[in-house]
Curated annotation (Swiss-Prot):
UniProt entry tagged with the keyword Ligase: no
Every 6-Cys domain range: 42-178, 181-326
Secretion signal span: 1-41
Cell compartments where the protein resides: Cell surface; Cell membrane
Record protein name field: Sporozoite surface protein P36p
Pfam families noted in UniProt: s48_45 (PF07422)
Organism: Plasmodium falciparum (isolate 3D7)
Swiss-Prot/TrEMBL keywords: Cell membrane, Disulfide bond, Glycoprotein, GPI-anchor, Lipoprotein, Malaria, Membrane, Repeat, Signal
Gene: PF52
Annotated S-S bridges: C59-C71, C85-C159, C102-C157, C185-C209, C223-C302, C243-C300
Lineage of source species: Eukaryota, Sar, Alveolata, Apicomplexa, Aconoidasida
Propeptide: 456-478
GO cellular component: cell surface; plasma membrane; side of membrane
Glycosylation sites: N109, N138, N229, N279, N291
């Protein structure tokens, strides 16, 4: 059919250009349509059902099947994603995978991968995938993933039986792009595209990170620099070692988080579910319950050599929303930094002068801490003794709504005190979308500029159209 169409086109080569263009479009459509049909026919794998049990999503392929089966699991934070290569002992079948060290290596964005498809190191592409730490997958493959990703991406591996090695089954996880980051502290000094937590710090100095947490919040901590074989990761410590399963309550008391915050949940779950690699053993996530009733202070720390980064979490129940004040945050952090910096100024060999100054500074710091403790106690008493009624709450909401509505309608309402870089990943944003950028915004290109590759400069645009106009006159005059 294609040959006849081409002969017909050659025979009428002298016809008007419009008809020639129509033939070309028609032929391209026919070829593309048949090509898509062939691709869909080749990729017609049998999609397996997903079984959900509690917090586990399970998908099973039968390695003894004569038809190629495909398991697809969509990323959902808090879910354990479990792939199973089902074997039949009666046939003495052994399950195999490709790549052999899946999930450390996998195929990325391959619709129908084969053994010859290019494979990549999973961690270098997407560090937020918590997988098994096995060199070889026997019959199961379990993983967690964080909800943050700066790209749409899918990872896949092949699963097959040694008695049926010509039929390759596919295990695939789909991860959707989202800009929203997790409330937490990243002490790994990571670039924005590899950071899924809102606050970025470095373990090149002593630092603290204070988080106010509420019901249903997801909190995270990370100590690891997400680069393979980076010297930053030498001598790292996460304390307590299984944070957030255990947390510091007070200065040095370690308690289980389920006892301190009932109905909370830690991701990853205990190592019996997922065997963590070293890359992921310095990260943890805490899911707070939807009925948080306690106002408490807990913490975990990251340590690198002599530098310590402390994550301090203040949990707040629903009553605390009426009195939440970010200024308390700054006071507590400032006291911490003042105490550290003042002690750092003195040397141990300065004798009596050193002791005199140190005592003076310690008294000053203790007075500050005493004042802060009194302020915190008054704050808690205010929360515990308050008796809310419907009118008070309605008045509070109405006042804050009016303030919000006034800001929303004001000329400068887009300017806020919150740093947008602490909430979203702007690593791939263009400068024209950045309201706080000092650079001149890029003009939007027109359809014709994109079509012909023309410059956005008005002078070059005029010259190009002039040349095009002269060329058209020459064509139609011949």
């Amino acid at each position: 059919m294609y040959v006849l169409v081409l002969i017909h086109m050659c025979y009428h080569f002298t016809m008007k250009r419009k008809k020639l263009f129509v033939y070309f479009i028609f032929l391209s459509f026919i070829i593309n349509f048949n090509f898509n049909i062939n691709i869909n026919f080749v990729c017609s794998n049998v999609i397996q059902d997903v079984i959900s049990i509690g917090n586990v999503d399970i998908c099973v392929v039968n390695v003894n099947s004569d038809e190629a089966q495909e398991c697809i699991l969509n990323n959902e934070f808090g879910k354990l994603l479990l792939f199973v290569c089902n074997m039949n002992d009666a046939f003495s079948t052994t399950a195999k995978t490709h790549p052999e060290n899946c999930p450390s290596r996998a195929f990325v964005n391959q619709s129908n991968p084969t053994e010859n498809s290019p494979e990549v190191d999973t961690y270098s592409i997407y560090p937020n995938l918590f997988g098994t730490n096995e060199n070889r997958l026997n019959d199961t493959y379990s993983l967690y993933s964080t909800p943050y990703s700066n790209m749409d991406i899918d990872f896949s591996c092949l699963c097959y039986g040694d008695k049926q090695d010509k039929v390759k089954h596919i295990m695939r996880i789909n991860i959707k792009k989202t800009r929203k980051k997790i409330k937490g502290c990243d002490f790994g000094d990571n670039i924005p595209s590899k950071r899924d937590l809102t606050n970025s710090l470095s373990l090149n100095e002593r630092s603290s990170c204070i988080i106010h947490a509420y019901s249903n919040d997801v909190l995270g901590i990370n100590c690891f620099k997400k680069e393979i074989n980076n010297s930053y990761n030498n001598n790292l410590e996460l304390n307590p070692s299984n944070c957030f399963h255990d947390v510091y309550f007070g200065a040095d008391l370690i308690l289980n988080s389920k006892n301190v915050i009932p109905n909370s949940r830690v991701i990853p779950d205990p190592s019996s579910d997922v065997k963590l690699s070293r890359n992921h053993s310095f990260s943890s996530y805490l899911i707070l319950p939807n009925n948080l009733t306690e106002n408490i202070k807990i913490s975990c720390t990251c340590k690198r050599d002599e530098f310590v980064g402390t994550m301090i979490i203040y949990t707040k129940n629903i009553n605390s929303l009426m009195f939440d004040n970010n200024n308390n945050n700054n006071d507590e952090e400032q006291i911490f930094q003042n105490k550290y910096m003042k002690k750092k100024e003195y040397k141990k060999d300065e004798g009596n002068e050193y002791d005199k100054k140190m005592n003076t500074d310690d008294n000053y710091i203790n007075n500050e801490e005493h004042h802060n403790n009194n302020q915190y106690n008054n704050y808690e008493n205010k929360i515990n003794n308050v008796n809310y009624n419907y009118d008070d709450i309605s008045k509070y909401i109405n006042e804050h709504y009016k303030n919000y509505d006034h800001e929303k309608n004001s000329k400068n309402s887009y300017k806020t005190n919150t740093n947008i870089h602490d909430q979203y990943d702007t690593y791939h944003y263009n400068n024209k979308y950045d309201l706080h950028s000092d650079r001149t915004r890029i003009r939007t290109r027109t359809f014709w500029q994109n079509l012909f590759g023309l410059s956005s400069s008005k002078y070059i645009l005029f010259n190009n159209f002039l040349i095009l106009f002269i060329f058209l006159i020459y064509i139609y005059s011949t």
